[in-house]
């Protein structure tokens, strides 16, 4: 199976990226494709293959955090796009598990100070609304983080003997995903959590995430962790990621029933 991987496209600000010359078997869009319904609408009309779609924080801007998922499901209805929010889908024997995975703000050890920093540093807490129309708080997104972590522990650690598992989250599951130069940045607690134990215990073949300041590719236990972001917020603007690859694809080899499997990059 060939899996295309991109994230943080910000199509409403940066325009549509170049498309792969050859459509993969599955396309993984790991969040922040566009604000509101723009990302889902674009993806549904752009890709002819099945699309795994996870929401990033940017998609919720100027929308209701609690109800927006269902609005997007209605938008995607009847298309080849699969919106995963603490959900699992099977495609050609591959198990895909997806969630936004908001952070716990404890990347630097103290969640309380991380939440205070988030309110000051992250514009999500100005522009994303709750059901009462008021700005959401770090406590609101931390509650969603706990729901996702609980789902991932229950689901991803349940062995899947008929194929391999791919986990897709928007926010990063490990501090190892933070690029050099940003590892002391207090804002990093808004896009990554220390979930190394979960990654190792889930033992997925691949964990795709987004929301960081550059490409990611490393092993954590038996799991390959990758990210391929196109753009990153800078102040109130955006800048492009120098090493973004619009055609980034991983191909799965091996037979999971025989306990074999590896990825090659194209």
Where are these regions (language model features)?
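A structural motif corresponding to the C-terminal end of an alpha-helix
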Residues: 76-81, 151-164, 197-206
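A basic- and aromatic-enriched beta-loop-alpha substructure that forms the phosphate/nucleotide-
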Residues: 52-59, 64-125
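N-terminal active-site segment of His-dependent metallophosphoesterases
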Residues: 1-53, 59-68, 138
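Binuclear metal-dependent phosphoesterase catalytic core
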Residues: 79, 179, 185-206, 212-266
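Beta-strand-turn-beta hairpins that frame and shape the catalytic cleft
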Residues: 1-4, 88-98, 164, 219-224
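Active-site-proximal loop/helix segment associated with metal-binding centers of metalloenzymes
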Residues: 97-166, 173-182
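Active-site neighborhood of phospho(di)ester-bond hydrolases with catalytic His/Asp-centered motifs
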Residues: 5-7, 27-32, 52-57, 82-86, ...
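Active-site environment of divalent metal-dependent phosphoester hydrolases
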Residues: 10-16, 34-39, 58-68, 88-90, ...
């Amino acid at each position: 199976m060939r899996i295309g991987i991109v994230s943080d496209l910000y199509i409403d600000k940066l325009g549509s990226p170049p498309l792969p010359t050859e459509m993969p078997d599955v396309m993984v869009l790991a969040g922040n494709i566009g604000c509101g319904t723009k990302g889902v609408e674009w993806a549904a009309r752009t890709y002819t293959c099945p699309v795994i779609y996870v929401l990033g924080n940017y998609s919720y801007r100027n929308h209701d955090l609690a109800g927006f998922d269902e609005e997007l499901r209605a938008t995607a209805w009847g298309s080849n796009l699969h919106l995963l929010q603490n959900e699992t889908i099977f495609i050609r024997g591959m198990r895909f598990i997806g969630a936004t995975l908001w952070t716990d703000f404890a990347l630097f050890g103290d969640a309380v100070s991380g939440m205070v920093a988030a309110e000051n540093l992250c514009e999500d807490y100005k522009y994303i609304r709750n059901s009462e129309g008021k700005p959401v708080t770090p406590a609101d997104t931390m509650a969603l983080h706990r729901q996702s972590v609980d789902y991932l522990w229950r689901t991803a650690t349940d062995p899947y003997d008929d194929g391999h598992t791919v986990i897709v989250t928007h926010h990063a599951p490990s501090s190892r995903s933070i690029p050099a130069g940003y590892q002391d940045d207090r804002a990093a607690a808004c896009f990554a959590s220390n979930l190394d134990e979960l990654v190792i215990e889930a033992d997925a073949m691949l964990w795709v995430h987004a929301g960081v300041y550059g490409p990611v590719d490393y092993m954590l236990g038996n799991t390959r962790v990758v990210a391929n972001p196109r753009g990153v917020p800078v102040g109130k603007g955006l800048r492009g990621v120098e090493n973004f690859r619009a055609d980034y694809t991983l191909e799965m080899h091996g037979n999971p029933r025989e306990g074999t499997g590896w990825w090659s990059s194209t």
